[in-house]
Amino acid sequence: MKMAGWKKKLCPGHHLWALGCYMLLAVVSLRLSLRFKCDVDSLDLESRDFQSQHCRDMLYNSLKLPAKRSINCSGITRGDQEAVVQALLDNLEVKKKRPPLTDTYYLNITRDCERFKAQRKFIQFPLSKEELDFPIAYSMVVHEKIENFERLLRAVYAPQNIYCVHVDVKSPETFKEAVKAIISCFPNVFMASKLVPVVYASWSRVQADLNCMEDLLQSSVSWKYLLNTCGTDFPIKTNAEMVLALKMLKGKNSMESEVPSESKKNRWKYRYEVTDTLYPTSKIKDPPPDNLPMFTGNAYFVASRAFVQHVLDNPKSQILVEWVKDTYSPDEHLWATLQRAPWMPGSVPSHPKYHISDMTAIARLVKWQYHEGDVSMGAPYAPCSGIHRRAICIYGAGDLYWILQNHHLLANKFDPRVDDNVLQCLEEYLRHKAIYGTEL
């Protein structure tokens, strides 16, 4: 009776008016129905509702990561110079810079995990069946800057993936506790079972990844590939794009592997020892085991599960692992050499035709200061728009268009204290592309 009375009030007893009112009621009912069907907390991947534009819009609005400043991220990602200059000028204004989130902030907000994940806008369900069926493993080695770690985790997070986090034993206790608090909110993120003190350019950097490899192989997740990261990395592809790129490898690995220069050969000519730092001795090392040809690359790799298994279990691999332990920066020649070893799954021959530069491999995009220059004159890339640290570009907003033109899965280095605009725009770009499948 109440419903009938409500209809009479809304729709007076005129036939034409009544027809219009019933049409209005139908539209309202449809919109309410769509709203209920688009419950973003319980979307079914196979449902038509999930694929509808209306639901995508609702989902994006609940998860979008817009830049917090008045910068034109769409223009920056497209290389619009006016937008880039505005962002670079904006970054110079100290008063506009937000202080980084602290260990204490994360210790407090993670007391309520659901609030933390909602407020920090983590994607908590697979965005496609293809992604669900192709889980990726991550080895994440960190030692400082808790907000950097949390934003990196958020950017690469998907509930079907598996994440091992190694924290440097030397890190402050509050940092370690904040990392533990964050990962306690996710069933598929865990701390490495064995932690080591990481010394720059020493074996410990490799050991951190090996510890995560062991743990990841013991997990119940049937991951296909392993990616390793550090705290200054950030993805430049969505999880869906990564899955597609990894499938195209067809079991092969992707990492830099080139012939070493004479200066780099000195890295394994003498033995190195570790105290608080790494220092050379006068002790000459024996040649590589079985006169294996040595190659150089970097610390980062895209490795198949079978490759990882052989790193840990194959006797020939273990002999090489032992041999490189007292060399300088072994992470930059161990993986590169194993990638050319004939017994390793997914490797490539040692013949020069198979040399792989960092620009050819998909593991990591880096701008080296000594390679920057005029592209029209043959330089591989333009000068860094941020600053340099250890001859590596800390990206600025002017680098983002170039970054997004490359095929790599991740890029290095980012630091929000140097330029947060480039990171915010990259976050906005990736989140938009993850939900809509299109660029900003």
UniProtKB/Swiss-Prot annotation:
Pfam families: Branch (PF02485). It catalyses: a 3-O-[beta-D-galactosyl-(1->3)-N-acetyl-alpha-D-galactosaminyl]-L-seryl-[protein] + UDP-N-acetyl-alpha-D-glucosamine = 3-O-{beta-D-galactosyl-(1->3)-[N-acetyl-beta-D-glucosaminyl-(1->6)]-N-acetyl-alpha-D-galactosaminyl}-L-seryl-[protein] + UDP + H(+); a 3-O-[beta-D-galactosyl-(1->3)-N-acetyl-alpha-D-galactosaminyl]-L-threonyl-[protein] + UDP-N-acetyl-alpha-D-glucosamine = a 3-O-{beta-D-galactosyl-(1->3)-[N-acetyl-beta-D-glucosaminyl-(1->6)]-N-acetyl-alpha-D-galactosaminyl}-L-threonyl-[protein] + UDP + H(+); a beta-D-Gal-(1->4)-beta-D-GlcNAc-(1->3)-beta-D-Gal-(1->4)-beta-D-GlcNAc derivative + UDP-N-acetyl-alpha-D-glucosamine = a beta-D-Gal-(1->4)-beta-D-GlcNAc-(1->3)-[beta-D-GlcNAc-(1->6)]-beta-D-Gal-(1->4)-N-acetyl-beta-D-glucosaminyl derivative + UDP + H(+); 3-O-[N-acetyl-beta-D-glucosaminyl-(1->3)-N-acetyl-alpha-D-galactosaminyl]-L-seryl-[protein] + UDP-N-acetyl-alpha-D-glucosamine = 3-O-[N-acetyl-beta-D-glucosaminyl-(1->3)-[N-acetyl-beta-D-glucosaminyl-(1->6)]-N-acetyl-alpha-D-galactosaminyl]-L-seryl-[protein] + UDP + H(+). It is found in: Host Golgi apparatus membrane. One of its GO terms (molecular function) is acetylgalactosaminyl-O-glycosyl-glycoprotein beta-1,6-N-acetylglucosaminyltransferase activity. It is a single-pass type II membrane protein. It is an enzyme of class 2 (transferase). GO terms for biological process: protein glycosylation. Its EC number is 2.4.1.102, 2.4.1.148, 2.4.1.150. Residues 31-440 are lumenal. The keyword Methyltransferase does not apply. InterPro entries: Glyco_trans_14. Disulfide bonds join C73-C230, C164-C384, C185-C212, C393-C425. GO terms for cellular component: host cell Golgi membrane; membrane. Pathway: Protein modification; protein glycosylation. The keyword Glycoprotein applies. Residues 1-9 are cytoplasmic. It comes from the Viruses. The chain crosses the membrane at residues 10-30. Keywords: Disulfide bond, Glycoprotein, Glycosyltransferase, Host Golgi apparatus, Host membrane, Membrane, Signal-anchor, Transferase, Transmembrane, Transmembrane helix. Glycans are attached at N72, N108. PANTHER family: BETA-1,3-GALACTOSYL-O-GLYCOSYL-GLYCOPROTEIN BETA-1,6-N-ACETYLGLUCOSAMINYLTRANSFERASE 3, GLYCOSYLTRANSFERASE 14 FAMILY MEMBER. Non-essential glycosyltransferase that can synthesize all known mucin beta 6 N-acetylglucosaminides. Mediates core 2 and core 4 O-glycan branching, 2 important steps in mucin-type biosynthesis. Has also I-branching enzyme activity by converting linear into branched poly-N-acetyllactosaminoglycans. Contributes to the post-translational modifications of structural proteins. Belongs to the glycosyltransferase 14 family. Was acquired from an ancestor of the African buffalo around 1.5 million years ago. This is Beta-1,3-galactosyl-O-glycosyl-glycoprotein beta-1,6-N-acetylglucosaminyltransferase. It comes from Bovine herpesvirus 4 (strain V. test). The lineage of its organism: Viruses, Duplodnaviria, Heunggongvirae, Peploviricota, Herviviricetes.
